[in-house]
Amino acid sequence: GCCSYPPCFATNSGYC
């Protein structure tokens, strides 16, 4: 998963 840090979480917000 790519939900550990803000930049990546924001990009995958609908997928995290």
Swiss-Prot record:
Subcellular location field: Secreted
Cystine crosslinks: C2-C8, C3-C16
Gene Ontology CC: one annotated term: host cell postsynaptic membrane
One annotated GO molecular function: acetylcholine receptor inhibitor activity
Top-level taxon of the source organism: Eukaryota
UniProt keyword annotations, A-Z: Acetylcholine receptor inhibiting toxin, Amidation, Disulfide bond, Ion channel impairing toxin, Neurotoxin, Postsynaptic neurotoxin, Secreted, Toxin
UniProt note on tissues of expression: Expressed by the venom duct.
Modified residues (Cysteine amide): C16
Subcellular location, principal: secreted
Region (Ser-Xaa-Pro motif, crucial for potent interaction with nAChR), start-end ranges: 4-6
Recorded domain comment: The cysteine framework is I (CC-C-C). Alpha4/7 pattern.
Function summary: Alpha-conotoxins act on postsynaptic membranes, they bind to the nicotinic acetylcholine receptors (nAChR) and thus inhibit them. This toxin blocks mammalian nAChR alpha-3/beta-4 subunits.
Family, similarity comment: Belongs to the conotoxin A superfamily.
Name this protein carries in UniProt: Alpha-conotoxin AuIC
Source species: Conus aulicus (Princely cone)
